Structures are given as structure tokens and as C-alpha cells.
Amino acid sequence: MPSLLVVIFVIELFVQLVNTIGAATINNLLWRIALSLPLPLSAQFAAQRKKQKEYLAIRRELNATSSQDEFAKWARLRRQHDKLLEDLEKRKKELDAAKTKFDRTLTTVRVVATRGLQWFLPFWYSREPMFWLPYGWFPYYVEWFASFPRAPLGSVSIVVWQWACTGVIKLVIETVMAVVGLIVAARQKQQEKQKAKQAVPAAGGGDSKAEEAK
């Protein structure tokens, strides 16, 4: 069984990553992965794409056919067009319903695996010490706060450990994002400078040609 310290840290890390990336982005990524797997859903999606290609081909041919000069052909293409369009709309509704169900399932699993455990574990292990502070190193009020709410005095409670993990992970993520933002901004400025340097000789060349013409 993994240590409770590690479990709490992993849960908080996952929660912060979801908050940073975005639940909708993660759902869309997992949806694309599900469509690429050999599942009935992916077969349904492939059939829908195939029908869509057929529909576009019929539509192009229909637009290129005159309803006056080639009425019989135009009428046949029109029937095929309407039938494929109706089939596509039906398949789209089915896929949209499957996507909605998929998102709800993921949301439920994510809430249970994160928010549920965030509340359940501190309640269930509120009296369990995560680890002990060195004896006599800290004053009473520090030991009392570290053991909040019901852990033995002189220990670090699961609630305080959870707070510490959340704070440290947030700080690290914000630092990494700030560093990445600075790197991206620096590269953009460097590219702009290079473009400006490339534009200057062109302007200078035009002036020299004008002087020669004079």
C-alpha cells in the first residue's frame, strides 16, 4: 500500500494539473484517444466520416449538374443528397449524445477521484500523524497548528500536509509557467529583431538604386 503522504501529494498534483490544463481540454484529448482505439465508438465515428465524404462528393456533383439540362440526373443526385444529409444528421446526434455521456462519466470519475478523496481522506485519517516533528524544536503554537485539527500534538496532520502540498505544487506550477512565458516572449522578440534586420538592407538597397538613377 502506498504511503498516505505520497497519496495526498499525487491527488493534489493531479488536481492542480487539471486546474492548469483545463477539464474540457483533457476531456477532448481523451475523446480523441477513445476514437482512435478499436472500440464500437471509433467504428461509429469512422462510418460517420465515410458518410460525410460521400455526402460532400454528391454535393459537389449536384452543384455541377444543371436542373434544367440534366433533370433526371439532378433529381437522382438530389435524392441521394437528401438521404445522406438525413443520415449524417442522425449520426451526428448519436455521436453528440455519446460525447456528452463520455464527458459526464469523466467528470464523475474525476470528481470522485479528486474532490471526493480530498474530503474523505482528511476526515478518515484526521487522527493519524503523517510524520513527527523533532522534539523540542518548535514552540507549542507551531506544534498545535501542525497537528490541526485532531492529530497528536507534535505531529503533522493530514490536513496540514494537504495544505502544504497544495501550496508547494501551485508555486512550482506558477514558476514553471512564468519561466516558459519568459522564454517564449524572448524568442518572439528575437524573431522580430531578425525580421527587422532583414528588412533594413532591403530598404538601403532601394535608396542606393535611387541614387544611382540620379
From Swiss-Prot:
Region of interest (Disordered), ranges: 190-214
Q: Which Pfam families does the record match to this protein?
A: CHD5
- Residue ranges the record marks as coiled coil: 73-107
Say which family it is in: Belongs to the WRB/GET1 family.
User: HAMAP family from the entry?
Assistant: Get1 (MF_03113)
Subunit comment for this entry?
Interacts with GET3.
Descriptive protein name: Protein get-1
Per the UniProt record, the source organism is: Neurospora crassa (strain ATCC 24698 / 74-OR23-1A / CBS 708.71 / DSM 1257 / FGSC 987)
